[in-house]
């Protein structure tokens, strides 16, 4: 059971980490000042969620690893993120559409996770759901 949970946590964490870094690429390059500030902040939210998920995965796996081991000490083939989040930022519209897809899906996911029996996951989900709702409001949904 712990291997399945660890794998699921890593999938979620990798999605959030990679997309967080992709969004931060817009710092100083977005078409308007509002977006120039909002996109990197959304990226920071995602990276914060990734940190929580990596930390929880370390606790579940119980092999004396740190969140940094999962986030930075793996080769590129060991990441288990979905392909959507790693796609390059071709242009601003593409980035916003990618963020829309991810945020809608994750808001639904985190809403469902709030009903979990896993208290740690519920805690992460509570914060992440609020952030996803905020991200959706920033992209005017």
Walk through the language-model features, giving the residues of each:
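Acidic/His metal-coordination segments adjacent to aromatic residues that form catalytic metal sites
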Residues: 1-10, 73-98, 116
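Short, Lys/Arg-rich amphipathic segments at extreme N-termini
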Residues: 3-26
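Conserved small/polar residues in nucleotide/adenosyl-binding loops
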Residues: 140-141
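Internal, conserved structured core segments that host functional sites
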Residues: 84-137
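Amphipathic, well-ordered alpha-helical segments in soluble domains
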Residues: 15-23, 49, 53, 102-109, ...
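Carboxylate/His-rich catalytic cores and anion/metal-binding grooves
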Residues: 41, 47-65
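Alpha-helical scaffold segments that form or flank carboxylate-/histidine-based iron centers
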Residues: 4-11, 30-49, 95, 120-134
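Helix-loop segments that flank and shape redox-cofactor active sites
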Residues: 19-41, 105-122
């Amino acid at each position: 059971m712990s291997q399945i949970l660890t794998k699921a946590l890593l999938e979620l964490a990798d999605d959030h980490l990679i997309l967080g870094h992709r969004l931060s690429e817009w710092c100083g390059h977005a078409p308007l000042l509002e977006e120039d500030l909002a996109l990197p902040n959304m990226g920071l939210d995602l990276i914060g969620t990734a940190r929580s998920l990596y930390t929880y995965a370390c606790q579940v796996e119980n092999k004396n690893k740190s969140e940094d081991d999962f986030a930075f000490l793996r080769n590129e083939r060991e990441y288990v993120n979905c392909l959507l989040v790693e796609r390059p930022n071709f242009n601003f519209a593409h980035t916003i559409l990618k963020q829309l897809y991810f945020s809608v899906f994750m808001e639904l996911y985190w809403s469902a996770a709030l009903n979990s029996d896993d208290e740690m996951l519920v805690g992460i989900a509570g914060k992440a759901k609020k952030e996803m709702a905020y991200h959706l409001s920033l992209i005017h949904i």
